[in-house]
Every structure is written in structure tokens, then in C-alpha cells.
Amino acid sequence: MKQNVADYSFEYKKKKQRVIQHAVVLVVSVFLCLTLFLNFILFAVYTNSSSMETDISKDGVSFVCPFLKKPSRGQVVYLSPLDEEKLPVYKSAVNLIINFFALQKYKPFGSTNSMTGKHSIRRVVALPGDSYYMKDYVLYVKPAGQNFYLTEFELATKPYNIRIYSVPVEWDGMGCAGTLPETTLAYDEYFVLADNRIEGIDSRVYGGIKSERIEGRLIWQVFPFNKMKLF
């Protein structure tokens, strides 16, 4: 019976093993680099609520840059949960991997509270040291060191839209308020709002947020395609 040279060629087998090993190393390296890039340099998030409509679509996908953690007025940020649980290293690693493939929609470990246990996307409207008050769902801001109030739109770095619609009279005092008294933010405290001022849960409910809760800034909405935009 005639034998193939591959059956007895030691050098051929070694070369074949090296090719396979190099291919495996290449695939693993690409996967790790991609995972690190999409988790620590630029990662995708899925918007599963209408709290930021109309500018940020429900069921949309946007990219967040975690290096941009010092926002200006009017910019959109990605916030950590209010009651985020401190996890051991192995659980955090599992969360990181699964969360990457789930577009930041699901983590197997940690809080599952629908209001305070999830990440959220909100717009920064007032900075540390600013004074503010709200009237008819529009925030008026007096920047730190200045003497006059301006609307949130006049101070924003880019124009944006908010959603306000009529609610029944019986709703007065329920849900998110459309009026707030004059208040001054403390050091390292930001005031954030949902663009949907009727449905969104934001600083009107939980107050100003610390910078440690800001995990990055939204820079690009990629889906739906007809609403693709840079922030």
C-alpha cells in the first residue's frame, strides 16, 4: 500500500502544527484586541427605552467613548447604576465578556432593579457650581461665577430637542416634576435630565450625580441608519 509523505514526515507534521498554532494565536489575539477596544476605547450600547427620544431612538445603538468623562453642558453621557453592586473579579470578568456580546444590555451578576440597577443614558444640563431652577420642564442655569440665568438650550454646546406633552391634571405631583426650586450644585456634582421630560427618571428624582457615575460620553448613534448622527 502506498503511503503519503505526510504519514512519516516529522518535519511536515511540525510545520503543520506551527501553522495551526499560529492561526489559533492570531484568532485569539484579534478577539482579545477587539474585546479590549470595544470595552475600554469605544463600546456599543443599546437604548431600550424612550427616555431620550427624539434625538436618541428607542431600540437604537450608539457608541460610547469611556475616555470622555468630563462632559460639557448639553452632552450625553452613559451612567452607571445608582445601586451598583461591588463584585468579585471573576464575576466582573464574566459580566464584561457577556455584556460585550449583548451590547451592554445584560449582565448575569449584579443588581436587577429596573430603575436603579441598570445603566442609563442622560444629558448633562448643569455643571458643578452651577445654580438652576426648572419651569415648564425647561431648566434655567446660572453658570458658576456668573450673574444671570439662561435656558439649557442657550448654554448647550450643540442644539438638541426635548419631548414634552400634556398630562392629565390628576397627574400633578406625580412622576417627574416640571418645576424645581432654585438650587446650587456642589463640587463634583452634575445635573442630568432625560430628553423625554415626562417619562424619564433623572436628577429630578435622584438629585445631582457624582463624576464617578459617568462611564463615558455618547459620540455616535449608528442605528437606526436613518437617524445616524454624531453627538
Regions of interest found by a model, annotated:
Residues F43-K58:
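Alpha-helical transmembrane signal-anchor/signal-peptide segments
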Residues K2-N4, S29-L34, Y46:
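N-terminal intrinsically disordered, low-complexity, charge/repeat-rich segments that act as generic
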Residues V24-F40:
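Hydrophobic membrane-insertion alpha-helices, especially the h-region
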Residues K2-Q21, T54, K58-F231:
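Soluble "head" domains of membrane/secretory-pathway proteins
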